[in-house]
Amino acid sequence: RAGLVGSDGETHQGIFDLSYLSLIPNMCVMAPKNKWELSDMLKFAISSDGPIALRYPRGEAYDGLSEHRAKIVYGKSELLYDEECIALIAVGSLVKTAHEVRQNLKRKGFECTLINARFVKPLDEERLLALTKEHKLIVTLEENVLEGGFGEHVSEFYEEIGSDVQVMNIALPDAYIEHGNVEILKKECGIDAETIEKKIIAAAMGL
């Protein structure tokens, strides 16, 4: 269980786990988008060899996007919506937020691909490479600090292959986050749908 936990206290916030787990050799790190995928990932983990960390949020499980339930394949992300120009790649609990952002942007004339990362480690490098063909802006979204997290690894991948695609990382600040209502904390940290939407529009206007 990880991510922002609200009123339990600032030392209970699980915001560094993706960073330190990614450092462990042979470790597989997964994050489900909803309760159905959590069940599927548990079954996948039981039938797999090697260590697997399965990250899920505190609180009631999200039951949206239930129509998207592609088979889990090791190291592969899930394509939820396929469009052009902007690609949103979200981890775990932020898939719900990214879906809301995509719907709002679409109403304003911005087309967005939406990808459920599923795997934080290993990265789906095949998908990341394919995105550069039809997208100018790649946005990563995670409920973890940027340093050592999913977004930083995605940015490093594009830098290593010499891609000129623009990458925006949506993540938590590198700091201890005070206790409080989770939705309020998300807004204060800039990972709520409204704030993310504004950042993407500003970046997209400059493409």
Question: Where in this protein do the model-derived segments appear?
Answer:
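Conserved thiamine diphosphate
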Residues: 1-47, 199, 205
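Thiamine diphosphate
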Residues: 4-14, 47-207
